C-alpha cells in the first residue's frame, strides 16, 4: 500500500509523512530527495519548475514506487504531485495508491514558509505552486489547521489503518484454492485448477473430498446436508452423493459464460454467478446474470447486468443478498423476494478501484472482502467505511471467519489465477489471522 501526501510546498508533507510512516512502521520517502541538482538550483534561484524539469523526477519516483509495489512493501511518500498528469504518472494503477491532500490557505502556508530555514524552495515560489495545483477528485482532504499528530490520526482512521493485521500460512502447495466454507466443523474449499474439492480437518490436515472433471467453483449444502459444487466451464451444478458427482442443475442456457461462485441458503435456494465474458482470453468486460436454482424447480435468471458477479452472502435475517461485482469495483445488495427474485438493487460499498472477490458476512453485519488487485482483505461497513485491513502473504481471493466463534479469519490465496501458471507454481495457500 502506498500513501502519497500531496500539495504545495510548506503544507507539512514531510513532517506529517515521517510521523505517519513511524506510526504505521512503514518506509518514508521524501520526493525532495529525488530532485536533480539543476532543478534544486533553479528553484533556489526563484524560478519555478516546468513540466520538462519535473519529468525525470517523476519517472524516478514512479519507478521507485513500482518497486515497492512489486515487493509488497508499504511506503509513505511526501510529494507535491500538483497536477493530475503527475499523479497519473506516479500511480498508473491507482487502486493501491492513496493520495492525501494536506490543504490550507495561501496565507497560512506562506506564513509557515517565511519561518522555514535551510530549504531550497523560497517562499516567493508558493504562488506558482498554487497556480499549478489541480484538484485531485479521489484524494483524502486533510486540513492543515491542526497539529501534525492530529493529522496523522485522521489519515490513519480515514484509510482504515487503525486495525492492520498480517496473515500467516496454515497450508500450502495448492494450485488455486477458492470458495472456503465451513461444514460440520471442517473447512471445505475447491482447489480450482487441481480440479478437486478439499477439506481441512480440525487438526489442520487436508484431505480430498472428490476429483472433478471440470473446474470446480462455488460450494454449498442443501438442508439435508447434500453438498453442491459448481462445474464452471460446463455451466452446471452437481451434487456430491456417496463420493460421486450427479447432475443437479444445467445452467448452460442461462449463463453468459463460465459459472463461478454460488451461495446456498437455509431453504436450499442456490444463487450462481458467472463471468459474463472470456476473462482469461482478455475479452472486453460484459455484464452477466445471477441465476437462481430453486429447490425442486427450474433455474431462472433473477438479476441481470451484473459485472462479474462473484462472492455472495446473505444477511442474518435472510432478506438481503450481497454480491461482489468484481470488475466494477463495488459490492451490491438486493432484497430477496419470497420466490428468490432479487429486487431493489443498490450499492452496498464503492471500493474505488479495489476489486472484490470472495466475501463473508461477520456476525455484526460487516463484511470481510478479499481484494486481489491490492493484495489485501478489507473489513467493511455498509457504505464503504474501511474498518481494517489484512495484508496477506499471497494474493487473496476468498475468506471466511472461523467457526464457531469467529476469532480467526481463513483466507485462500495464490500468486496467480492464470490456469497454466497456477498448475505449475502450486503457490496456493490457506492463510489465517486473528480478528478478535
Where are these regions (language model features)?
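Conserved substrate/cofactor phosphate-moiety recognition/catalytic segment
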Residues: 18-61
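Conserved lysine of the Walker
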Residues: 13
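Beta-rich, blade/repeat-based domains predominating
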Residues: 171-184, 212-231, 253-272, 276-277, ...
